[in-house]
A protein has these predicted regions:
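Short polybasic/polar patches that bind polyanions
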Residues: 110, 127, 150
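Conserved GNAT acetyl-CoA-binding A-motif
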Residues: 119, 126-137, 160
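Conserved active-site alpha-helix within GNAT-family acetyltransferase domains
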Residues: 116, 120, 140-158
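Conserved beta-strand-loop-alpha-helix junction that forms the acyl-donor binding cleft
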Residues: 110, 134-145, 162-165
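Glycine-rich phosphate-binding loop
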Residues: 113
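Acetyl-CoA-dependent GNAT
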Residues: 2, 6, 16-106, 125, ...
Length: 165
């Protein structure tokens, strides 16, 4: 299996971000989210920034300590190789789906199976919080991520399309 050759999840860990790391990460996360929205053609850049800002404020209503919002550094030994944002709702039995809001493997670590291994670790983290499924959104133009999620067994549950006139 390719994962065994490139990277096994046992060689990679997810470490909770420190407050200082979160403070550094949050502006980059917000900018990246706004850029993805605008790049998808869903809306102009100014509207994308407004949406990203509102969505982020809603998700992180209590800042770093917001319950159910988990952000990890993807660690390859002692080296930070990226980050992963996982949301797990409270113990409500009607809300047992965790959500991967974002994952990013740093450029120097790409192409080595780190994203795959981190997603497998995220599945375990979600299970440890009582989740029975894990969802995510992927922008249509992100073909590398779409291929990864397909190979991990994620099913398409919605598809949004647009045609410029």
């Amino acid at each position: 299996m390719e994962l065994d050759v490139l990277m096994s999840e046992s060689e990679l860990t997810l470490r909770p971000m420190t407050r200082a790391e979160w403070d550094e990460w949050m502006p980059r996360q917000l900018a990246g989210y706004a850029r993805h929205i605008a790049d998808s053609g869903a809306m102009p850049e100014a509207e994308a920034w407004a949406k990203a800002t509102a969505d982020t404020a809603r998700s992180w209503h209590a800042g770093y300590a917001t319950p159910g919002q988990l952000v990890f550094r993807i660690m390859a030994g002692d080296e930070a190789a990226g980050w992963l944002w996982l949301a797990v709702p409270g113990p409500d039995p009607d809300r047992l789906m965790g959500w991967v809001y974002n994952i990013e493997v740093d450029p120097a670590f790409r192409g080595r199976g780190y994203g795959r291994a981190a997603m497998i670790l995220a599945e375990g983290e979600a299970r440890s919080h009582g989740m029975t499924s894990l969802g995510l959104n992927v922008h249509g133009q992100n073909t590398v991520a779409r291929s990864l999620y397909d190979s991990l067994g994620y099913d398409v549950t919605a598809l949004q399309m647009k045609k410029p006139l």
